[in-house]
């Protein structure tokens, strides 16, 4: 398990080749990048909080691959991980984020007025719309590496900040450990709450230690603005509602997020961010905006079409099953969202989803009438 530094010194008694993990059957980004030479070069290093290379890669060693998506296979334990282990993380980031270079700069745009349209996605097809991101609080270790005290301090800070929100963002906090089993399951089934920590990716990285201590969910009174505390990231901020008004969802998201950041700053805390990687999060796949704008969309015909995957790829979108990353589609309903996180601004990513979903609906309508969709095939974005 992560968080043990004396153990790292112990390991160094063995030569690097004796400690190098067997990655022969692995299909993840870490396994593509990590060579015995790189392992030998980085294994003795650690961040100021004691996070090591072996801590970073453990989840990818224990989880060779995923049937639906290519996993990353490495996590950060603190803000410095991306710097201390940059020789591992930079190629992973480049591979994962479409050639993003170590010299590239990330751009942020949380002004919902810059989004064109998006308030009229057809509710006959779009069942719900959702935008989420993560935020990490500077000065604390990230979930794979944080201590109980750090986790509890993050919970306390977050709850204090969130309780200052007012208007339609005002709400309350529900600590996981004080929820009944039934309450918890209801929130999970309604897609409001993260699952119990059964995901091997969470378990192997050390993120599920001490569960459910200092974990919880804050949401406003009508459950359209939610904040998860201490799951994979310090904070996961989510705006969601039924139907196809992505503009409204994104506007609430930007307003709430900006207010939360201001509240943290008033307590002398800021979010981890730098000009190259944007917002720093636990998993390299979420760097940059950390943003996933998604819709649950009914595509019974297009979902079975041989060109469906190609269409999504060209639109820079990805599909997941109805229940999230580890699930299959039920009743022709897919969770469709932006594939990118880094190198595009928040507005650009939501725009891609809005424009792409409109085209998917047009294609579905064509197929309903038994007509071809070849002339609607998009160019690569």
UniProtKB/Swiss-Prot annotation:
InterPro entries, A to Z: ATP-guanido_PTrfase, ATP-guanido_PTrfase_AS, ATP-guanido_PTrfase_cat, ATP-guanido_PTrfase_N, ATP-guanido_PTrfase_N_sf, Gln_synth/guanido_kin_cat_dom
Bias-annotated ranges (Basic and acidic residues): 96-110
Residues given in the record as creatine binding sites: 72, 232, 285
Tissue specificity remark: In the kidney localized primarily in the outer medulla in the thick ascending limb and distal convoluted tubule.
Positions carrying Phosphotyrosine: 125
Gene3D superfamilies: ATP:guanido phosphotransferase, N-terminal domain, Glutamine synthetase/guanido kinase, catalytic domain
Chain positions with Phosphoserine modification: 4, 199, 309
Entry GO terms, CC: cytosol; dendrite; extracellular space; mitochondrion; neuronal cell body; plasma membrane
EC class name: transferase
Tagged with keyword Magnesium: no
Catalytic reaction list: creatine + ATP = N-phosphocreatine + ADP + H(+)
GO biological process assignments: cellular response to estrogen stimulus; cellular response to wortmannin; cerebellum development; futile creatine cycle; intracellular chloride ion homeostasis; phosphocreatine biosynthetic process
EC number(s) given by UniProt: 2.7.3.2
Binding-site residues for ATP, renumbered to this chain: 128-132, 191, 236, 292, 320-325, 335
Function: Reversibly catalyzes the transfer of phosphate between ATP and various phosphogens (e.g. creatine phosphate). Creatine kinase isoenzymes play a central role in energy transduction in tissues with large, fluctuating energy demands, such as skeletal muscle, heart, brain and spermatozoa. Acts as a key regulator of adaptive thermogenesis as part of the futile creatine cycle: localizes to the mitochondria of thermogenic fat cells and acts by mediating phosphorylation of creatine to initiate a futile cycle of creatine phosphorylation and dephosphorylation.
PANTHER family: ARGININE OR CREATINE KINASE, CREATINE KINASE B-TYPE
Family assignment from sequence similarity: Belongs to the ATP:guanido phosphotransferase family.
UniProt free text on domains: The internal MTS-like signal (iMTS-L) mediates targeting to mitochondria thermogenic fat cells.
Record protein name field: Creatine kinase B-type
Protein source organism: Rattus norvegicus
């Amino acid at each position: 398990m992560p968080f043990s530094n004396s153990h790292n010194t112990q390991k160094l008694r063995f030569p690097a080749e004796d400690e190098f993990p067997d990655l022969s059957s692995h299909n993840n980004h870490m396994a593509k990048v990590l060579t015995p030479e790189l392992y030998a070069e980085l294994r003795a290093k650690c961040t100021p909080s004691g996070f090591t290379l072996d801590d970073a890669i453990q989840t990818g060693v224990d989880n060779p691959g995923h049937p639906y998506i290519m996993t990353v296979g490495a996590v950060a334990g603190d803000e410095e991980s991306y710097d201390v282990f940059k020789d591992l993380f930079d190629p992973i980031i480049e591979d994962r984020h479409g050639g993003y270079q170590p010299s590239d700069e990330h751009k942020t745009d949380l002004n919902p007025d810059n989004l064109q349209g998006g308030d009229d996605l057809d509710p006959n097809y779009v069942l719900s719309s959702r935008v989420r991101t993560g935020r990490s609080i500077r000065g604390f270790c990230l979930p794979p590496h944080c201590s109980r005290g750090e986790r509890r301090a993050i919970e306390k800070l977050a709850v204090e900040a969130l309780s200052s929100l007012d208007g339609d963002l005002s709400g309350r906090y529900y600590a996981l450990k004080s929820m009944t089993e039934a309450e918890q399951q209801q929130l999970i089934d309604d897609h409001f709450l993260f699952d119990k920590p059964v995901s091997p990716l969470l378990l192997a990285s050390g993120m599920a230690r001490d569960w459910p201590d200092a974990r919880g969910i804050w949401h406003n009174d009508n459950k359209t603005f939610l904040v998860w505390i201490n799951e994979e990231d310090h904070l996961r901020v989510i705006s969601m509602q039924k139907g196809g008004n992505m503009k409204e969802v994104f506007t609430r998201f930007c307003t709430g997020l900006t207010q939360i950041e201001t509240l943290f700053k008033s307590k002398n805390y800021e979010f981890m961010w730098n000009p190259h990687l944007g917002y720093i999060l636990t998993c390299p796949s979420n760097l940059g905006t950390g943003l996933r704008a998604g819709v649950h969309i009914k595509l019974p015909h297009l979902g079975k079409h041989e060109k469906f995957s190609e269409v999504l790829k060209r639109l820079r979108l990805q599909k997941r099953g109805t229940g999230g990353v580890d699930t299959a589609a039920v009743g022709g309903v897919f969770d469709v969202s932006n594939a990118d996180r880094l190198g595009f601004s928040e507005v650009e990513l939501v725009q891609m989803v809005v424009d792409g979903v409109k085209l998917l609906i047009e294609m579905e309508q064509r197929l309903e009438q038994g007509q071809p969709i070849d002339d609607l095939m998009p160019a690569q974005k």
